[in-house]
């Protein structure tokens, strides 16, 4: 995993993942579980998706996205990540597990689910305006988030189901995102 270099949160997650994997190799006697989660959604979640729906953003009838980009996105419910964390602590399982609900939602579909109209915008204009809004402290996220939204991580959850023994109850579909 390389993360998204211009979005520090993503970059740091990838660095921590690499360090944990190195530790796991150097200390096989220690049980290490690395959980790579997709975007968590639910009524108690505070993350980038929930911030995009808060004031003043919720008053806009549209949401910008990079023209030509309609990436597939995955989600994981609060209930599922809670169960996965519990099982990781209680079980003897070891290794790296990708955690996401089954299926994907396209970014423009997510925008419509949020009750907005997708507004395609040239990449340079969107990056520049987001950087300016971040610098002015008017946006809750830096322009680097656009890379994560253009090139999101889509997980293969086979090991979660077969080795870890858990299949998320909620899927990455319209019903779960709402």
Where are the regions that the model predicts?
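Active-site Tyr-X1-5-Lys
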Residues: 4-33
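Residue-level signal for the nucleotide or nucleotide-sugar donor/cofactor binding architecture
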Residues: 11, 73-79, 105, 155, ...
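NAD(P)-dependent short-chain dehydrogenase/reductase
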Residues: 23-73
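Active-site loop of classical SDR/Rossmann-like NAD(P)-dependent oxidoreductases
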Residues: 144-157
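Amphipathic terminal alpha-helices
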Residues: 161, 170-178
